[in-house]
Structures are given as structure tokens and as C-alpha cells.
């Protein structure tokens, strides 16, 4: 059985036991949360709606992404860095 969940304007195909990195969620560590499922597939039949239970494992920053801008013939350079927050979750169960 697997489900499609949506969090942070992104969709993920998950099954029980999966560990995902999603955009930052406002929950603490070891907290159990319910995420809405767009659809659930079980034994070849598709059901729309439902809930997916997950556990928050940690919240941290991702790797640094460097943004480099260079304007030719202007002697202008800019180097910026960005680290996005993410939440690591574990899928506990997929509800009906």
C-alpha cells in the first residue's frame, strides 16, 4: 500500500517505513503528525483522500547552495549562500 501526500506545495509518493526530507514543518522532534493523503493505492484500487501518520525525526539546515552572479565588462561579482531548513519525517501508517 502506498499514498501520495502533499506538504509544502510538493507531492511525495510514500509507503510505510519511508524517511523523507520535506520543507520545514512547525512541529517538535518525536511528535506524531497527520498529513492529508491525496490518494491511497491498496491492492490495485485507488481511494481519494485519507490520512497518513508520520513522526518528526529532526529539523535542520540543508547543504549550502552558492549563488554566483557576474556582470561581464562591469567588474562586478556577487557571491551569496543559502541554507534551506528541512524537517526529516518517518511514515508510520497509511490510514483509510
Swiss-Prot record:
InterPro entries: bL21-like, bL21-like_sf, Ribosomal_bL21, Ribosomal_bL21_CS
GO biological-process terms attached to the record: translation
MF-aspect GO terms: rRNA binding; structural constituent of ribosome
Keywords tagged on the record: Ribonucleoprotein, Ribosomal protein, RNA-binding, rRNA-binding
Keyword set includes Ubl conjugation: no
Keyword Signal: no
Top-rank lineage group of the source organism: Bacteria
CC per GO annotation: cytoplasm; ribonucleoprotein complex; ribosome
Physiological role: This protein binds to 23S rRNA in the presence of protein L20.
UniProt record similarity statement: Belongs to the bacterial ribosomal protein bL21 family.
PANTHER family found in the cross-reference section: 50S RIBOSOMAL PROTEIN L21, LARGE RIBOSOMAL SUBUNIT PROTEIN BL21M
Subunit description: Part of the 50S ribosomal subunit. Contacts protein L20.
Protein name, entry field: Large ribosomal subunit protein bL21
Lineage of origin: Bacteria, Pseudomonadati, Aquificota, Aquificia, Aquificales
Gene responsible for this protein: rplU
Amino acid at each position: 500500500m502506498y499514498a501520495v501526500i502533499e506538504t509544502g506545495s510538493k507531492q511525495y509518493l510514500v509507503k510505510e517505513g519511508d524517511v523523507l526530507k520535506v520543507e520545514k514543518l512547525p512541529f517538535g522532534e518525536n511528535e506524531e503528525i497527520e498529513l492529508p493523503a491525496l490518494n491511497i493505492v491498496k491492492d490495485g484500487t485507488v481511494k481519494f483522500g485519507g490520512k497518513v501518520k508520520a513522526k518528526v525525526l529532526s529539523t535542520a539546515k540543508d547543504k549550502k547552495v552558492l549563488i554566483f552572479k557576474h556582470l561581464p565588462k562591469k567588474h562586478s561579482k556577487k557571491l551569496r549562500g543559502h541554507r534551506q531548513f528541512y524537517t526529516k519525517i518517518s511514515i508510520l501508517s497509511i490510514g483509510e
